[in-house]
Design a protein with these regions (language model features):
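HDAC/HDAC-like amidohydrolase catalytic core signature
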Residues: 1-172
């Protein structure tokens, strides 16, 4: 996959996601995607090194749709998952959790840690949206990671979805 991204980037850009056709990069796109992934990792590192109390990585391209071997939904690399895996491998953490609250399912983050018992993913998203067929409550992880994926698909009605989101977070 990395070689594909590299070649498309070197050859002037183009489409990476053949399955959904939603991820294009331009010439030099690999460098930009690597900067975004590095930004996510640097944010995690800053928190682990206690340089900051918390961090928000405002990066493009985003990452929650990119799967281990496939770009998707404008995402080249699964940046949050890369940051989380950095925390596990270099930060001395035993467990991590990802909260993905977005209209689309966080399929890429979920796919990266699908079998990892150290990583919990919670995705709150609109049901039957993007990617098609993804994010059902039956998706719970696999092997040692069974039970570590929690999907909360909300109805497509914006008012119902918003109200339900507030109830999930107990925000009044």
């Amino acid at each position: 996959y990395m070689e594909e991204v590299k070649q498309v980037s070197i050859n002037g850009g183009g489409n990476l996601a053949q399955r959904w056709g939603t991820t294009r990069i331009g010439s030099g796109g690999l460098d930009i995607a690597l900067l975004a992934a590095g930004g996510a990792i640097a944010s995690v590192k800053a928190v682990l090194d206690r340089k900051v109390d918390n961090a928000y990585a405002l990066i493009r391209p985003p990452g929650h749709h990119a799967e281990p071997e496939e770009a998707m939904g404008f995402c080249v690399f699964s940046n949050a998952a890369l940051g989380g895996m950095y925390a596990l491998s270099e930060g001395g953490l035993d467990r991590i959790a990802f909260l993905d609250w977005h209209v689309h399912h966080g399929n890429g983050t979920q796919a990266v840690v699908w079998e990892d018992p150290r990583a919990l993913t919670v995705s709150i998203h609109q049901e039957n949206n993007f990617p098609p067929g993804s994010g059902g409550i039956e998706e719970i992880g696999a092997k040692d990671g069974t039970g570590t994926a929690i999907n909360i698909p909300l109805p497509p009605d914006p008012l119902v979805g918003f109200t339900t989101s507030l109830e999930i977070f107990s925000i009044t």
